[in-house]
Structure formats: C-alpha cells, structure tokens
Amino acid sequence: MKFLDSAKIYIRSGDGGAGCLSFRREKFIEFGGPDGGDGGRGGDVVVECVGGLNTLIDYRYQQHFKAKTGVHGMGKNRAGGRGADAVLKVPVGTQILDEDGETMIADMTEAGQRLVLARGGNGGFGNAHFKSATNQAPRRVNPGQEGVERTVLLRLKLIADAGLVGLPNAGKSTFLATVSAARPKIADYPFTTLNPQLGVVGCDGREFVLADIPGLIEGAHEGIGLGDRFLGHVERCRVLLHLVGADTEHAGKAYKTVRRELEAYGGGLADKPEIVALSKVDSVDPDTLKQQAMRLKRAAKRAPLQLSAATNLNVQKALRAVLAEIDAAAVADAAGTAADAVVWAP
C-alpha cells in the first residue's frame, strides 16, 4: 500500500429537507386543514478514527465528500427522514486542520474516536406548523436549511513509542527488520527507505512500536534530500534511537549533522530522550571501530552502544535501553497529569 501522510479535502453536510404544503382531503370532511409534514435533517460529515490504517492514500483519489440531503416532508403530517451521514475513516494519529494549515480542529489519537466536522442543515417546517386561530389554511412552508461547506487538511503523524533516526545507510531498516516482523526495503545505497515504516518489537515479554523514518542529510530542513517532513512521524515518540554507522567517514560529524536537523525542525525533537548507538560494527576492522567509537563519544558526550543488527550483537541491550526510556517517560507523563489535576474540596 502506498504511503500518504497529508491530504486536502472538501466537505459539505447535507441540506435539510423542505417542508410540505399539503391539506387533508377526505370524503365528508369539508375543511380538513393543513397536514404538511416537516422536512428531515441533512446528514453530517463525520470523521472516524479506525485501527488498521497507516496511510491517507484513499484521499488521494477522492477529495470531495457530501452528506445526503434530508427527505422532504409529506402529506398526512409525515416528517421526512434524516439524510445519511458521510463518514470519513482516518488512521490513528491523524490531525485535522483548518484550511489555513495552522488552526488545529482535532487530533485523532484513539481508535473509535468520532468528530462531526460539518453538521447537516435543519429540515424546513411544513404548513401544518403554521396553523393558527386566525389562519386555518396556511400556505406557508420553510425550505430546508443549507448544509455547511468547508475545506480541511488531514495530516498523519504516526503513533510510535520509539523512533529510529540517523543518516541514510546507518542501518535503521536492517535494525527494524531484525527486531520486528516489518520488512522494509534494504540495500547498500542511500535513501533506500522512502516512507516511514512501523514495526512491533518484542522485548522481555513486552511489546512496543518502533518507527523507522527516511534518513536525514545536512540541509534537510531546507528541503535537501527528502527534506524533514517525515520527522513529524517521530514527534509523538517517547524516545529516539540514534544510529550512526561505523562505516561512515566520521561518526562524530554524522551524529552532529542529524542533531542539527532535529534542532532546526523544532517540535521538541531535540529535547527527547536519546539513545546513541554505533551500528554496523561488524563491517569495519577493530582499529577503525575503536576510532569511530571515540569520535562518537566525544560528539555525543556519552559512551555509545556498539551493535550489529546483522550479527545480533547488543541488539537486545539496545531494546532494553529503549524500553527503560519508554517506561521513564510514561512515569513522568503520569506524574504531570496528577500534578495538573484539580483537587475538589467542598
């Protein structure tokens, strides 16, 4: 399935049904009076968050959505039926923005979450509604209220517990394929990964979701390479696993390049907990490995993990470190929520 993380759609709720102009006509009833029913309400445009989706590709081929018009009122005081809703299904993690691209309407973060984007128009009154002591045979009816029309933007930010970042060819896809059932494309040339990939990782009887995003290069925040637009998919991650290939020219410079791009992107990415690992250690000789490890240690100001996804060296150690950071972030979030809670007192 092709990946698409943004879409512009045009929506319109249904018009209300018109009221009915009708009079009671029966044998032996000389003055039957008005019996026109009210029109039905127009359908709503509803966004529903569903599990099992991780792309907005459906909205590439259809951008216009309109709910059904309410049924018109009928004689014998019969009201019209309600118009059918237009339901838009989106993946978990979809943000709904106004046409300006900045005003947030909603953030769909849970499966089953529903939001009415455009409410249908009310149905018009039939002539029975206007009967009075001074007007026994009204010929007045209301048309249905018009529906609401608007343009909205959908932006998907995948929800993962941890994110893989690094330069192209740092071994991110190989790592994801080793620790999960995900099967990203793997090759020895840059930008093999063109779209974010998700994998469910098992570690010590527990599971978490790991996201692999396309590699960053210097100047990505200015649009060079694939740009930095995919960094939005790790905004929700609680921890970043930063892989630096041991076969790169200078591990320290490679690390600093990615850090500069994270800081330039903003969104709090540079402040997230980070685990630094020197990957592909099986691809270099011991002297080169020692030199690269020292360079990375000086740049990151901490001793990096040394791992190899191809030989499984220290892979479990890296996963346990990620899991520990996820747990620490969860505890911090819970403490923050408790601190913000208002204590009720009589």
From Swiss-Prot:
GO CC terms: cytoplasm
Top-level division of the source organism's lineage: Bacteria
BP-aspect Gene Ontology terms: ribosome biogenesis
Key words, A-Z: Cytoplasm, GTP-binding, Hydrolase, Magnesium, Metal-binding, Nucleotide-binding
Cofactor: Mg(2+)
Cross-referenced SUPFAM superfamilies: Obg GTP-binding protein N-terminal domain, P-loop containing nucleoside triphosphate hydrolases
Annotated GTP binding sites: 166-173, 191-195, 212-215, 279-282, 308-310
Binding site residues for Mg(2+): S173, T193
The keyword Chaperone appears for this protein: no
Domain Obg: 1-159
Main location: cytoplasm
InterPro entries linked to this entry: G_OBG (IPR031167), GTP-bd (IPR006073), GTP-bd_Obg/CgtA (IPR014100), GTP1-OBG_CS (IPR006074), GTP1_OBG_dom (IPR006169), GTP1_OBG_dom_sf (IPR036726), OBG_GTPase (IPR045086), P-loop_NTPase (IPR027417)
Assembly mode: Monomer.
Entry-linked NCBIfam families: Obg_CgtA, PRK12297.1, PRK12299.1
Family in the record: Belongs to the TRAFAC class OBG-HflX-like GTPase superfamily. OBG GTPase family.
Biological role stated in the UniProt entry: An essential GTPase which binds GTP, GDP and possibly (p)ppGpp with moderate affinity, with high nucleotide exchange rates and a fairly low GTP hydrolysis rate. Plays a role in control of the cell cycle, stress response, ribosome biogenesis and in those bacteria that undergo differentiation, in morphogenesis control.
Protein name: GTPase Obg
Source species: Methylocella silvestris (strain DSM 15510 / CIP 108128 / LMG 27833 / NCIMB 13906 / BL2)
Classification of source organism: Bacteria, Pseudomonadati, Pseudomonadota, Alphaproteobacteria, Hyphomicrobiales
